[in-house]
């Protein structure tokens, strides 16, 4: 199925690209979430008429994401207290939600879906650098310090 992308999609293309995708991917993800339209003659004309508006919207989203990334990078280390054993091993773990809640409490809005923990949840005390993806093109690093509760 041929579609016109209305947003930048990782590993697929950017705004205005006409790409061929599987019908299920288009029907279940791209079309319902407004990330693409079916590539027919009428939609191509409508898209070309709205191209400048859509590009301006994407530029505004990118500017907002960049500003948020700068705020996140400017944060001092976010401290999270958790119960831990004598050797610094946590009873449980610190996951995406815990990090997002701690950063939000520190003053910068952060959703748990934006936190990237490629090695899994944090299971020991110490200092960690956690990657945060606020936009498909914008990433920031947040310093997280996990300490044992007294």
UniProtKB/Swiss-Prot annotation:
Can you tell me where the transmembrane regions are? none
| Source domain of life | Bacteria
MF terms in GO: rRNA binding; structural constituent of ribosome
Establish whether keyword rRNA-binding is in the entry: yes
Role, per record = Binds to the 23S rRNA.
User: Which HAMAP family is this protein grouped with?
Assistant: Ribosomal_bL9
| Name of protein | Large ribosomal subunit protein bL9
Gene that produces this protein: rplI
């Amino acid at each position: 199925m041929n579609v016109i992308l209305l947003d930048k999609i990782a590993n697929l293309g950017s705004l205005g690209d006409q790409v061929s995708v599987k019908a299920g991917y288009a029907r279940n993800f791209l079309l319902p979430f407004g990330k693409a339209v079916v590539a027919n003659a009428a939609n191509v004309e409508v898209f070309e008429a709205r191209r400048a508006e859509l590009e301006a919207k994407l530029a505004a989203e990118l500017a907002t994401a960049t500003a948020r990334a700068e705020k996140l990078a400017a944060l001092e280390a976010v401290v999270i207290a958790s119960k831990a054993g004598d050797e610094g091993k946590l009873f449980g773990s610190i996951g995406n939600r815990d990090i997002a809640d701690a950063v939000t409490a520190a003053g910068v809005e952060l959703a748990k879906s934006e936190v990237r923990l490629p090695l899994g949840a944090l299971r020991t005390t110490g200092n960690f650098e956690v990657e945060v993806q606020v936009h498909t093109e914008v990433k920031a690093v947040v310093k997280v310090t996990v300490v044992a509760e007294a």
